């Protein structure tokens, strides 16, 4: 029998006025993770404007590794570029019966995003080696997009971490900050 195990860190906090009444789990950092995919693709909008709607969708979302999704993600790169992919190995999320597929990068939920970033970097003439690292040429462009959307030209992330797919993920706020913003 297969057992799926996950560890999730949760934090809850609430406020009255400016005072935090209760906080459980600590004043932890909140990371954008997959919800940031559309903003991560913004630096490449102009050079990727010729993509099909399916390709645009797979580049800004997560998928379950089915045949249609994998085919669309693969269509973003030439077969000779497939070896550049650095997302983790995975199996399709939905399989019936016995596990028969070996783990592949294309089955990973973020393979479309990885392929689109690689394609965008190629079209912009950027070096793609180490594209998943924060010192990659596209990363400062992504930070500029966030600064523009937040209206904070000097903003810096509190921390840069590695997401489960290998891309950098940013700590945007502490859990107490939205608590204060949405207080009653």
Descriptions of predicted regions:
Residues 1-29:
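Beta-lactamase-like hydrolase cores
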Residues 10-13, 38-46, 116-120, 173:
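Contiguous, well-ordered alpha-helical segments that form the cores/surfaces of helical PPI scaffolds
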Residues 16-18, 46-52, 81:
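Short, solvent-exposed loop/edge-beta patches enriched in aromatic
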Residues 21-27, 51-61:
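Glycine-/proline-rich flexible loop or hinge segments
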Residues 29-38, 167-171:
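Short, conserved micro-motifs enriched in small and acidic residues
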Residues 32-49, 68:
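Active-site SXXK
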Residues 54-153, 157-165, 172:
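Active-site-adjacent helix/loop patches that line small-molecule binding or acyl-intermediate pockets
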Residues 173-174, 178-184:
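Single conserved hydrophobic/aromatic residue that forms the stacking wall/gate
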